[in-house]
Amino acid sequence: MKSLKQIVYSWVDKKFLGGCSNYNSLSTRKSCRSKKQAREMFSQNAIPHAKGEIFWGFVKPFLFAKKYGFPIVVKPNVSGFSRGSHFPINNYTQLLKAIVLVKIWWPSSVIEQYLKGENYRVVVVKNEIMSVIRRYPPFVIGDGNSSIEELIDRENDLREKMALYPVIHPIGKNLRTVRFLKKSNLCFTSIPSKGEMVTLYNRVALAPGGIIETLDKDSMHEQNRELFLKIIPYFNANILGIDAIFEKGIDFPYTDQRVIFLEVNSRPYLKMHHYPRYGKKQELSHFYDVLNRLEIQQKDIF
């Protein structure tokens, strides 16, 4: 069984974690490998988080939706980069479809309450915030003259000029985008009004063209800073990428708004912090100097 697990996680590492950092021990990585583990730790330490459950079959998610209502999110228990996630789910038909599709990624799945707000990745090292980014789904801004397709081409050209590829991806002009636009009665030939933001997909992941904005760490409210720093000792980690949604924003105290801490990443993808579409490129070399000097136990064992 042990060798089988090593084979599985080795495959996951090569297939899905290419380019991810590796500064935590095996015991730390094991302690936050699944979303369930993170949620349990959040619950034990009064960290605001979404109510959620692990499920294998079809009954439990429907009972969860009946108890807590919509919107909700369904995602694999073990995953990253928003792979296999489905949200916002607003009715039972969408829920059934999500239950079927989520099993493509992992046999055990998560159903949670969904919060609409600002999505952040905060990278924390011991006693210090390393980097703060806000993540957006792919979007374009109308100029009153250009079609959505033209705006996408312009945005992709700009990303290429900014040398964001291949870390940041181009926005796809594919069936997925067509279907998403159709939900808003839009298509590639539609012409948005000047200043109108047109969202092209619902996920903040990089693969469909998600957008990264770096933020000044000092813009984070002090209460929020203390909350993020509080988390890393719970996992005995050297570094964590912590994902959270703030209803108003990270510059407002978490006590004055709805906040959901989603998960912790023991191998955060740090490359994206160096290729922002918006905000300043961050200087993080002194953090890497410290991290690279660490002796990591069982670094290459999964």
Where do the model's predicted regions map?
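Active-site nucleotide/adenylate-binding loops and adjacent lid/helix of ATP-dependent enzymes
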Residues: 11-172, 221-225
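Active-site "cap" helix and flanking loop/linker of ATP-utilizing ligase/carboxylase catalytic domains
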Residues: 148-183, 280-302
